[in-house]
Amino acid sequence: MGKGHEMKATSGVQGTLAPERLVGGLPTMYCFETCPFCFKVKALLGSRGIEYSKVEVDPTFKTQLKWSDWGKVPIYVDQDGTQVNDSNHILHYIDQKNGNLFPRAGEDMDQDHWMDFSNNVLGKSIVAVIYTTYWTSVGALDYVTRVDNFSRTSRLINKWVGAIIMRMVGKSRAKMFDLPPRENLQHQLDEMSKGIQGKFFGGLGPNGADFANYGILRSMQGLNGFDLVEGHAVISGWYN
């Protein structure tokens, strides 16, 4: 779907195919390396053993998304050119085509609730913790200095200017909750643990809520605040 298209881009499966956006003829995901929502999709693709290509998107300028009206990551382009926008929609699309092992949206209220929780609560909670200071923000964005398809200038801008931007984003996310960032994340992990039915949200096997929330927390690994995940009585066991 090009920039000149009159229809406003939406989440979910798009009506126009984009086969020219495939890399190496494989399903292709457009993503940021540390994006929590991209890690959801990576988790499911890895679990199903699906080979795919990845296009690393410049987080400041998003040059690699100029072709799409949808300016957010992740974007998933399947082998036939089908474009799917938004992480939870991508999870449902991939599962439906590869095993159909968990319910579709609207078929399981608990799964829907916890998948929404991953976007609306957990994803925002971890951003407030990761980007709590300028220097934790710089640390989280250090990966951009190692991305081959970014120019040297782009790498520097994304690391140093991007850290300022993400610190501001972290502040705005923190204001969404009553508790300070670390205490809030601890509280949300406690809340999340109530939805785990045995080993998984899905009971005996993982469902969409497992992949959605695991992906969010996986993006924190090695960054500020992950100790809360590792130290949680319920979530640490579920995560591992």
Report residues per predicted region:
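GST-like fold's C-terminal all-alpha helical module
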Residues: 123-234
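GST-like domain detector, emphasizing the conserved glutathione-binding G-site
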Residues: 2-154
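Intrinsically disordered, low-complexity polar regions and short flexible loop motifs
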Residues: 236-240
